[in-house]
Design a protein with these regions (language model features):
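Extracytoplasmic/secretory-pathway proteins
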Residues: 21-224, 230, 234-242, 248-392, ...
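Bacterial N-terminal signal peptides that target proteins for export
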Residues: 1-8
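Bacterial N-terminal signal peptides
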Residues: 8-16
Length: 862
C-alpha cells in the first residue's frame, strides 16, 4: 500500500513539474539596459539634450530631436514637453490625445448652476460618470466649454443671474451641448423680441449646434452670415469657423473631386483669416497645415522639415506627429513600389523560361507601373453588402450615414442598418424595427442607443485630423536610391533616412556629405556606418579625435571609433579611449555608459576586469509591459487600493503587504548586474574552474556571489563533479544556512548513489537552484510547491528565430572573451552540451524521482 501511495505522490510531482514546464521564462520584473527604438527613461533627459549614443534603430520621431541638438540648437520647455508627450504616445501604443476636458466641463456646470439653481434632473450630458469625467466625444472640445463658461460669466456680469434672457441663454446652450453626445438638437432661432445681445448670441448658438451635429451645410451658411455682421461679438470666431466647418465637411466626403473642392474653399477662407491680425490667426495657420497635409503632402513635408529643424512654432506637437506620419507614408509608398517592380520582373523571368507570353508585353506593364502617388486623397471605402447566416446587413443608402450593429438577446441573430447622422434615438428605434420586422425589446433599444452614440463618436474621431498612412510590413529594405527626390532636398529629412539605412550606399553618401559640410552631424553619420577598411576611414578617425567632448555628437562618434579600432585589432588604442571616457566626468545616459562598458568588457585581459566592466546598471525596469523604477511600481500598486476591492484589509495593511511583496525587488533598484548577453557568455564559455575563480573575485558585489555559488553547486552536482560541489558548498551555506541539514546528508552519504540521491532531494526541495547563471533580478522565491515560471531551469534553446530569413537557425556561440584560453572555452562547451542533454528540470527530476521510487520503494523521501 505504501508503495502505491509513494508512487502516486511521485507521479503527482511529475505532473506538477510538467505543468510548470510550459511557462519557463524570466521573472515578472526585468531590468532594462537599452531600448531598441525609444530613448531611455525618463524621456525628459533626451528631450533636454542628453542624447548619448544614437542608434539607427531609434525611430525617426526620436532622431528628429537629436538632429537639432547635433546642429547646436535646442528646444524650449514647451517643445520638450511636446516631445515627451509624443514619445509617451508612440512607445506606449496610446492614441495621441489632447488634454482631458473634464475639469473644464465641471467649471461650466458650476457656472451654469449659478443661473438654473437646483434641478430635479439635470441634462444627462452634465451628469458625471461613476468612473470620472463626462460622456462627451471630441467634437465638443475643451475650448467650447471654456468659451461657454466665459460668455455666461460676461452675461451674468452684465444682466444678472436671475435675468430671464440669461436663463434662456443657458437653456439654448444646453441644447447646443446635447449634440456633443449624438443626434441633432437646435435652439430656437433668434427673433426681434429678443434683446440685441441675445439675438447675436442665439445666431451663434444655432450655428454651433449645427456644427456639432455634423450638419455642415447649415453651419457654414450661418457662420458665414455672422462673419458678415461686424456688430456681432462672434464675427471673428464665425469667420474662422467657416473654414473649420469646410474641413470637417471635406473629411467626411468619399468623393475625391468634391473633397478637393471643399478643401480648396477652406484654404481660401483660412488664408484670409491667417493674414489678419486676429486671435484666430494661429489657429487658422494650424488648419492650413492640415489642408496641405491632405492635399499636397509633398509640399507639407518640406515645410514641416524646415519648421522643425530650426525653431518650431505654436503647433510644434502636431507638427512633429504630421511630419513623422508623412515620412512613414512616403517610405511605405517607396517600398511598395519597389515590391511591384520586382514582382513584374519576376514575371518576365518566368515567361522567359517558359516562353508562355511575349516578353515585350510584360516589359510594357513594368513601364506602366504607377508612380508613387504622394498626393492621393482618402481612398473610397466600399459598402459591405454581404449576407451571412442569421444576419441581415442593409445596404448603405446615403454617404455619411451611421452604421449600427445590433443583435438579438439570445445572440443568434444580428442586424446591420444605417441611419442619418442627425437621427434621434426615436428615429433610430423606428429604423431598427423596420429592418428587424418586429418591436425592439428594452435591451435592444439600449443597444441601439449606445451603438448610435459610438457610431456618432467614431464618425468624428475617424476624420478629426491627419490620418496615418504609414506602416510597411513587407520584406523590402529601404535604400537611398528608392527615395523620391523631394525627400532629399531638406537636410533634416535627408539625414533621418540616411542615418537609418544600412550598407555601403549609406556610408558613401554620408561621407560625401561630410566632405561637403565638415559638420559633426555628417561625421557622426559616416563613422557610424564605417567598417574597418572603409573608403577614406583615416579622415574620419582623425576628425573624431578633434571632437569636443561636450558636443552632442561626441558619445556616438567615440563609440564607433572604439568599435572600428577593435575591428582593426588595435585593442590597446581602443582600451585607452574607453578608459578615458569611463573615467571622465562625462554626463552620459545610463544606457550609453552601458554600451561603453560592454565594449570595454570585450577588451578585458583578466577575469576580474571582465567581471568589473560587464556589470551594467539598468535605467529602468519592466513589469508586465510597464517601465519605471521599483518605487514607481510600488506606488502604482498602492494606488489600486479601494475599500470595495479589499474589504478585508485596511489601507495600511494593504500597503504594508505591497511593501513586503516588493522587498527583494527594491534591493535591486540601484544595483549593477549582468545583462543577458554577458550571462550567455559565462554560461557557454566559463567551465566550472573559471566559475569558481569568478565567485571569489573581489570585482563581484556580495549579492552576485550568491548567484554564482548556487549555479556552481547545482552544475557540479548535475555533472557528477562532487569535488567541486564540496568546494563551493561553504559559500552556498553562507548565503543559505537553512540548507545545512540537507547538505549534511550529502556529505555523510556512504555511497556515490546515496550522495546523488541526497543531492537530488536538495535540488527538488529548492526551486531557486539552476546550473545556469541567472540574469536580471534572479530568483527570490524558494518555496517548494508554490510553482513559479522561473523555478529550477529550462534547457537552453538550440535554435532561434532569424528575422532576416524568417527561419529557425542554430543558436550561434558568442565570441570567447580574450582572457580565456581555447581549452577553457572547450571545457565549458563540453559541460554545456551535457546540461543540454539533461534537459528541462521538470523532465529530468520527474524521471529521476520515478526511478528512485522504483529502486527504493521504502525510502521516505519519495
Amino acid at each position: 500500500m505504501k508503495v502505491i501511495i509513494r508512487f502516486a505522490v511521485s507521479t503527482f510531482l511529475i505532473f506538477a513539474f510538467f505543468a510548470n514546464a510550459l511557462p519557463c521564462g524570466p521573472s515578472y520584473i526585468t531590468p532594462l539596459f537599452e531600448y531598441e527604438h525609444a530613448p531611455e527613461n525618463p524621456y525628459e533627459n533626451f528631450a533636454a539634450g542628453k542624447i548619448g549614443i544614437l542608434q539607427p534603430s531609434q525611430r525617426r520621431i526620436v532622431l528628429i530631436a537629436a538632429y537639432r541638438y547635433l546642429n547646436g540648437g535646442g528646444f524650449s520647455d514647451a517643445e520638450q514637453k511636446a516631445l515627451v508627450e509624443v514619445w509617451n504616445a508612440e512607445f506606449n501604443n496610446q492614441p495621441y490625445e489632447e488634454e482631458n476636458i473634464s475639469e473644464t466641463v465641471k467649471k461650466w456646470v458650476e457656472k451654469r448652476r449659478s443661473v438654473v439653481g437646483k434641478e430635479e434632473k439635470p441634462p444627462e450630458i452634465y451628469v458625471e460618470r461613476e468612473y470620472g469625467g463626462y460622456d462627451f466625444f471630441p467634437n465638443c472640445t475643451k475650448n467650447a466649454f471654456e468659451t461657454a463658461e466665459k460668455t455666461l460669466s460676461d452675461r451674468i456680469a452684465s444682466h444678472g443671474s436671475d435675468d430671464k434672457d440669461v436663463k434662456d441663454w443657458v437653456k439654448a446652450q444646453d441644447t447646443v451641448f446635447e449634440n456633443c453626445a449624438s443626434g441633432k438638437a437646435t435652439p430656437g432661432a433668434p427673433n426681434e423680441a429678443m434683446p440685441e445681445w441675445m439675438q447675436k448670441d442665439r445666431a451663434y448658438q444655432v450655428a454651433a449646434a449645427e456644427f456639432y451635429s455634423l450638419d455642415y451645410d447649415s453651419a457654414k451658411q450661418h457662420f458665414a452670415q455672422i462673419a458678415q455682421d461686424y456688430n456681432s461679438p462672434w464675427q471673428e470666431t464665425a469667420e474662422y469657423l467657416v473654414g473649420r466647418t469646410l474641413i470637417r465637411q471635406a473629411s467626411l466626403s468619399k468623393d475625391k473631386v468634391k473633397q478637393q473642392l471643399i478643401y480648396t474653399e477652406a484654404e481660401q477662407n483660412l488664408s484670409n483669416v491667417a493674414a489678419k491680425s486676429s486671435k484666430f490667426s494661429d489657429s487658422a495657420r494650424k488648419m492650413l497645415g492640415l489642408i496641405k497635409y491632405r492635399l499636397r503632402p509633398q509640399e507639407r513635408v518640406r515645410e514641416l522639415a524646415q519648421i522643425i529643424a530650426t525653431q518650431g512654432d505654436g503647433n510644434f506637437r502636431q507638427d512633429l506627429i504630421d511630419y513623422n506620419w508623412l515620412l512613414d507614408k512616403f517610405e511605405k509608398e517607396s517600398l511598395e513600389a519597389e515590391e511591384k517592380r520586382k514582382e513584374e520582373f519576376n514575371k518576365i523571368n518566368d515567361v522567359a523560361n517558359s516562353n508562355a507570353e511575349p516578353i515585350n508585353s510584360l516589359l510594357s506593364n513594368v513601364a506602366k507601373l504607377p508612380e508613387t502617388d504622394a498626393n492621393s486623397a482618402v481612398n473610397e471605402l466600399p459598402v459591405n453588402r454581404a449576407r451571412t447566416t442569421n444576419s441581415s446587413i442593409e445596404t448603405q443608402q446615403t454617404e455619411g450615414d451611421l452604421k449600427i450593429e445590433i443583435y438579438s438577446e439570445d445572440y443568434k441573430e444580428t442586424w446591420t442598418l444605417y441611419i442619418p447622422v442627425n437621427a434621434t434615438d426615436e428615429e433610430a428605434f423606428a429604423k431598427a424595427e423596420t429592418v428587424i420586422g418586429k418591436p425592439l425589446t428594452d435591451k435592444m433599444k439600449e443597444q441601439v442607443r449606445l451603438a448610435r452614440k459610438e457610431a456618432y463618436r467614431g464618425r468624428f474621431e475617424a476624420n478629426n485630423g491627419a490620418e496615418y498612412e504609414g506602416g510597411y510590413y513587407g520584406s523590402e529594405s529601404l535604400s537611398l536610391s528608392l527615395l523620391p527626390d523631394y525627400l532629399r532636398l531638406d537636410d533634416l529629412t535627408n539625414w533621418l533616412f540616411t542615418f537609418q539605412v544600412q550598407g555601403n550606399e549609406g556610408y558613401l553618401y554620408a561621407l560625401s556629405q561630410y566632405r561637403q559640410t565638415n559638420s559633426n552631424l555628417w561625421l557622426l553619420t559616416a563613422i557610424s556606418k564605417a567598417e574597418k577598411s572603409s573608403t577614406d576611414l583615416s579622415r574620419l578617425l582623425e576628425a573624431a579625435d578633434k571632437i569636443d567632448r561636450n558636443a552632442a555628437a561626441y558619445p556616438t562618434i567615440a563609440y564607433h571609433k572604439a568599435r572600428i579600432l577593435m575591428e582593426q585589432g588595435k585593442t590597446a588604442e581602443a582600451r585607452k579611449l574607453l578608459d578615458d571616457i569611463l573615467n571622465s566626468g562625462l554626463d552620459l545616459p545610463i544606457s550609453s555608459r552601458n554600451k561603453f562598458l560592454a565594449q570595454r568588457a570585450k577588451l578585458s585581459e583578466t577575469l576580474d576586469d571582465y567581471l568589473k566592466f560587464a556589470q551594467l546598471r539598468p535605467f529602468a525596469f519592466d513589469w508586465d509591459g510597464t517601465s519605471g523604477t521599483i518605487e514607481d511600481f510600488i506606488k502604482q500598486q498602492k494606488s489600486w487600493y479601494t475599500p470595495e476591492s479589499y474589504p478585508n484589509q485596511t489601507r495600511e495593511e494593504y500597503e504594508k503587504e505591497v511593501e513586503e511583496n516588493f522587498k527583494n525587488e527594491r534591493l535591486w533598484q540601484d544595483r549593477t548586474m549582468f545583462d543577458g548577453a554577458t550571462i550567455n557568455v559565462m554560461n557557454q564559455h566559463f567551465p566550472l574552474p573559471v566559475l569558481l575563480e569568478a565567485e571569489k573575485s573581489p570585482a563581484l558585489p556580495e549579492y552576485l556571489h550568491e548567484r554564482f555559488a548556487l549555479a556552481i553547486w547545482t552544475r557540479a552536482v548535475l555533472l557528477n563533479d562532487f569535488a567541486t560541489a564540496a568546494k563551493i558548498a561553504p559559500e552556498v551555506l553562507k548565503f543559505h544556512p537553512e540548507l545545512q541539514e540537507l547538505m549534511d546528508k550529502i556529505n555523510f552519504a556512504k555511497t556515490p548513489l546515496a550522495k546523488k540521491r541526497a543531492a537530488l532531494f536538495l535540488i527538488l526541495k529548492n526551486p531557486m537552484l539552476s546550473p545556469f547563471l541567472e540574469d536580471g533580478l534572479g530568483k527570490a522565491d524558494n518555496e517548494f510547491g508554490n510553482f513559479d515560471a522561473n523555478d529550477w531551469w529550462c534547457a537552453p534553446y538550440e535554435t532561434e528565430y532569424d528575422e532576416t530569413t524568417g527561419k529557425e537557425v542554430d543558436v550561434k556561440l558568442p565570441p570567447r572573451p580574450m582572457f580565456l584560453t581555447a581549452a577553457q572555452s572547450n571545457a565549458a562547451q563540453a559541460e554545456h552540451k551535457k546540461l543540454v542533454a539533461i534537459g528541462d528540470a521538470p523532465n529530468f527530476m520527474g524521471e529521476k524521482v520515478l526511478e528512485w521510487a522504483r529502486l527504493a520503494p521504502t525510502d521516505k523521501r519519495v
